[in-house]
């Protein structure tokens, strides 16, 4: 029978990542793409990792937790601890760093409440975490009348993620015909978004007085993220050099070489290490275009550094207001990067400031002014929640309330299934082959949805063509 004991579990701690280093290393080693995608289907390891994207596949995280709870009857505090992980996921950006941290938190939860269960749980990887917490958000309460609408959007997102790995959309796919049937499209472009009935709005707790900022750097793990991508094409040469320097002084995660299977048992192609462990990232692949990559390093900073969100907000303000003339945004960014005094407001000068200075101006331009996923991540990220501190007694009561599910909403950002679906489709289109009609229709819908939600960005038409 379940008991009700007090739990001291707190998500988003770097100590949790380090504690589960061995398991996380194994997950990272299996997150590399084959060098020849055409031969990927011959690899049982690749097929096992990506099986979650099958249109009829169940959620591995849901299945794992359901089986554990059914067979082991955990303490009641388990449900509060799982709910607080979900709450943190709502306030985190959709990045590789977030996927890694959430996986570590889930491993910790299983170890705490199910000590007799197999550890680690078999066949759980970063893609499963991404689908559960960020794509499908399985933990959210849904308006029953809208469950089919919500499910259709999830199926569409899965289809585009699958296309990201295969390289192309199905020839039978027609967005112009399908999209109006999935959403209650407004008649006029200026109408408000119609997405809010999909989830139950207005039932969250005001956690504004609960979380308090912690000391800068207490649970930052940006150094680990840089190390994971040090030998890849994701970063500029200067940031790669910084990552290499960090790696030489770090005793953790030194065994990240991808696992090569026995050719006689699994005739898999050689793995592409230049793309890094990209199956842990939302992009599921690594592409470069005009000095940017499909892995946004600044978004990774949001998830892994407590100061990043405020720094980028201040930097954006400086870009927009430091010059009165009509100087291009890229030039403004360059001027600030080259002026040491202009970045003196950054407290973490050794790491965060170095990363920002080492980024290409195009990376910063894309993140601050162009990319819809970067804009969404900036709105979702709440550093006070992710890196803040909460009194133990209040935190225990807060977790118990969250366990009912009614309060699992963002503190300040209005959830929008339609917007998040369109952004995922847009990002997938940047890496897959699709007909021009599909591309233009999706870009039009993304631009319209961004305007409805008060995002001020350059047209997605330009972002689609110049960046990745």
UniProtKB/Swiss-Prot annotation:
Zn(2+) 1 binds at residues 59, 62, 132, 138. Residues 296-374 are annotated as: Zinc finger 2. The keyword Protein transport does not apply. Zn(2+) 2 binds at residues 296, 299, 367, 374. It holds the Pfam family Herpes_env. One of its GO terms (cellular component) is viral envelope. Disulfide bonds: none annotated. Transmembrane segments: none annotated. One of its GO terms (molecular function) is zinc ion binding. Residues 59-138 are annotated as: Zinc finger 1. Plays a role in efficient localization of neo-synthesized capsids to nuclear replication compartments, thereby controlling cleavage and packaging of virus genomic DNA. Belongs to the herpesviridae UL32 protein family. This is Packaging protein UL32 homolog. It comes from Alcelaphine herpesvirus 1 (strain C500) (AlHV-1). The lineage of its organism: Viruses, Duplodnaviria, Heunggongvirae, Peploviricota, Herviviricetes. The gene is 68.
